Amino acid sequence: GPLRVRTSKMALPAALLRAAALRCRLPLASVGRRHLAAEAFVRDRPHVNVGTIGHVDHGKTTLTAAITKVLSESGGARFQRYEDIDKAPEERARGITINAAHVEYSTARRHYAHTDCPGHADYVKNMITGTAPLDGCILVVAATDGQMPQTREHLLLARQVGVRHVVVYVNKADAVSDAELLPLVELELRELLAEMGYDAERTPVVVGSALCALQDRDPTLGRDSVLQLLEAIDTHIPLPHRDVQRPFLLPIEGVHSIPGRGTVVTGTVERGAVSKGDECELRGYGRVLKAVVTGLETFHKSLPRAEAGDNVGALLRGLRREDVRRGMVMGQPGALRDHRKLQAQVYVLSAQ
């Protein structure tokens, strides 16, 4: 049967950064309470992967929480507080996001998996890992600061890993003493977008305050701006093409064990589809393993079939926890090949 999965933040070592333009995958789920999912995932609208990027302390996690709060009013999300998203003790103590976190929500048109990426320069490798699977991203910029070092760096990295569509949220508008500064911030950001190769004229820029939305203050800057942002995401970020016809492939990012049940691997399905009961093959580190998928789950919900773009935990029979390592791949039997040569794009982190 399906397993119970809860989202969590996980440390992502640099060794996880994979080739093919750093198209890494984020460990989106870890095994939590060990019983069956009470709810089935309903695939009733297109699935899109998005995320928040931007400079440290510009409000990415606050905006993520605000989105879930606003959508919870219409049943489109489960409200997750800031503290629910920034779970790690060090993150709470320092007030910054270190590892990418993951939430889900739905608008009237789409289902979203949302990655909240860290903004601090020390954790840029985690930001790269969180951004690579995205179909589009939300660039969060504090109106009080304007463009900052990680604003530029995150936008550049997003472009390099293949994120082609961006929506801008100018946050903390309630804290600006002179409202005439807001158009200048927007102008500066459009110049940056053009410099990085994005369509500066057509990129939506929404001005608001995520904190106002969380605290039910100033509906125009708060709740209304979040709804405006969601509308911009719905319309500006196109539906991605999902490669569901080719053989199933899932890069493994997390490995867990449920005593008496089996081994769980987590990751984002890169192509194809897999169903409960399917046989699969795992390769990597010189090993070839066989297993059977006995359960699939996403965001606390069981699903009979996972498709390209889905963030899943798969329960496997026939494997021990110590047999599988992060960095291996799972796929359709006979469809995987080992390679010794690759092309990679390398981003060298500097002390600055």
UniProtKB/Swiss-Prot annotation:
The lineage of its organism: Eukaryota, Metazoa, Chordata, Craniata, Vertebrata. This is Elongation factor Tu, mitochondrial. Residues 209-211 are annotated as: G5. It is found in: Mitochondrion. Residues 45-241 form the tr-type G domain. GTP binds at residues 57, 59-62, 171, 174, 209-211. Mg(2+) binds at residue 61. It catalyses: GTP + H2O = GDP + phosphate + H(+).
